[in-house]
Amino acid sequence: MAISAKLVKELREKTGAGMMDCKKALTETDGDIDKAIDYLREKGIAKAAKKADRIAAEGLVHVEVKDNEAAIVEINSETDFVARNEGFQELVKEIANHILDSKVETVDALMESKLSSGKTVDERMKEAISTIGEKLSIRRFSIRTKTDNDAFGAYLHMGGRIGVLTVVEGTTDEEAAKDVAMHIAAINPKYVSSEQVSEEEINHEREVLKQQALNEGKPEKIVEKMVEGRLRKYLQEICAVDQNFVKNPDETVEAFLKAKGGKLTDFVRYEVGEGMEKREENFAEEVKGQMK
């Protein structure tokens, strides 16, 4: 199949590999991005790539906590300018509070639910769009609960570009829970612990690491030991509790919380626009279009 320049560019952005290496990888894997990433890793050309798409869309993430319930929500706008608008920021907080009050479970149900003003969220969003002059959309939200003996940690980075909500059991130390939320914002783990990693993912990673070691010309008798060592390192990179704590790299996140009598049981991390692609605009073409 013909490999487009756009596909090569996407693979380069995800792996940091050279153009020709990316083109060859895509050719060998029939244009499958995920398989091409594995191909490059097995050849030792690229490190493990987080298979998240480019961060592109604008907007805000907000975390709202009320007693034993907390909500995290992402609302998108078209420009960063609007994301800094006070009216938009108030809208995001209003929606986050309503999510907790209404106990809705899906975005569709949220849009149909009524605010205290009697208007639906959908009507409120349309009002805001009319006032602000940009397309706005509620992309996603999550609700978490805890007991009186636990703590929520809420952290917003860059004014809401990244938002994290943590649930820590066994302690009411909100500051410690917030510190862990800050760690998760910075390091971006995929899981709480290795117990959450599927057997399928572990087996897939083990196979990639094995091929990588064999392609490096390592003797087969030591490959198994190398693979297990690298697999442990991989799990440490993607599991929050096993990572070196960002505020004190001499201890793990698990050890930090254990000293406080707590244990991380859940987290939600939203980054504005992750997995979304921004419309690519050609400025010259845009000007031409306005002159017609």
Swiss-Prot record:
Q: Keyword Manganese, does the record have it?
A: no
* Compartments, as annotated in UniProt: Cytoplasm
List the residue ranges of the region (Involved in Mg(2+) ion dislocation from EF-Tu). Answer: 79-82
Q: Which Pfam families does this one have?
A: EF_TS (PF00889)
Q: Name one GO molecular function term.
A: translation elongation factor activity
Q: Does the keyword Signal apply?
A: no
Per the record, the domain of life is Bacteria
Annotated GO CC locations:
cytoplasm
Q: Which InterPro entries match?
A: EF-Ts_dimer_sf, Transl_elong_EFTs/EF1B, Transl_elong_EFTs/EF1B_dimer, Transl_elong_Ts_CS, UBA-like_sf
* Key words of the record: Cytoplasm, Elongation factor, Protein biosynthesis
Q: Which family does it belong to?
A: Belongs to the EF-Ts family.
Q: What does the UniProt function comment say about this protein? A: Associates with the EF-Tu.GDP complex and induces the exchange of GDP to GTP. It remains bound to the aminoacyl-tRNA.EF-Tu.GTP complex up to the GTP hydrolysis stage on the ribosome.
Q: Which protein, by its recorded name, is this?
A: Elongation factor Ts
